[in-house]
Amino acid sequence: MTSSYIGSELHLFSKATNWKAYYGRVIKKYLAGDVLEVGAGIGATSRVLCDGSQRKWVCLEPDAAMSAAIQEQIEDGSLPVCCEARNGTVADLNGADRFDAIVYIDVLEHIENDVDELSKAADLLKEAGHLVILSPAHQWLYTPFDGEIGHYRRYSKKSLLEVIPPRLRRVELCYLDSVGMLASIGNKMLLKSSMPTAGQISFWDKRLIPLSMFIDPLLLRRLGKSILGIWSKT
């Protein structure tokens, strides 16, 4: 795994505007007040989820170059003024930091010790605050591409629940992108491709995601290649 490879992946998936808008609509109501986005990358997700109504939106990113790029976007107005770029991890935040929402969008699977990570995150949540996690689903869909971009795992409902601190109460746990899951199965069994091309990302985002947006509710969000979990601190 290289940082340039991961950077290429981030730039590719930054074009997945339908996908970001889809999950954004599901979680947006939880993103108010003081928000911490862990692993903010190049700011592509921040641009979709942060609409400027929040009191503070901390873009926490361990890669110094990516964190600097986020700071540039704040300064040039690409990101709302409530955004704040910080270089580091949750372990670097001090006791004064408390958040109404903590968001992991395609990040937790990159963290080797996810149990310890989420315990620290729970400490940073205010009472009644929300933890929001979106990650790749189903370990049986794990491919060499997952390993190349630094994924330690993919999650099922069971495996994700096992790493959530017991002091958090489950609000929602579901799967998203049922049509994309079928495409992923086809890729794993037939194509066996590694890094997706820009054309493949565009096809998935423009053709398959609209279908998933229609079909997922009909399936009660029981199938999908991504898992979404929301918990509240009580």
Spans of features found by a protein language model:
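Conserved N-terminal segment of class I S-adenosyl-L-methionine
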Residues: 1-105, 115-118, 197-202, 210-214, ...
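Residues lining the SAM
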Residues: 105-108, 134
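A short glycine-rich, Lys/Arg-flanked "PGG" loop and its adjoining helix->strand segment in the class I
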Residues: 115-130
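Short, glycine-/aromatic-enriched active-site segment of Class I SAM-dependent methyltransferases
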Residues: 131-153, 157-163
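Conserved S-adenosyl-L-methionine
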Residues: 168-179
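C-terminal helical/coil "lid" or tail adjacent to the Rossmann-like core of SAM-dependent
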Residues: 180-209
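Core SAM-dependent methyltransferase catalytic element
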Residues: 186-192, 222-234
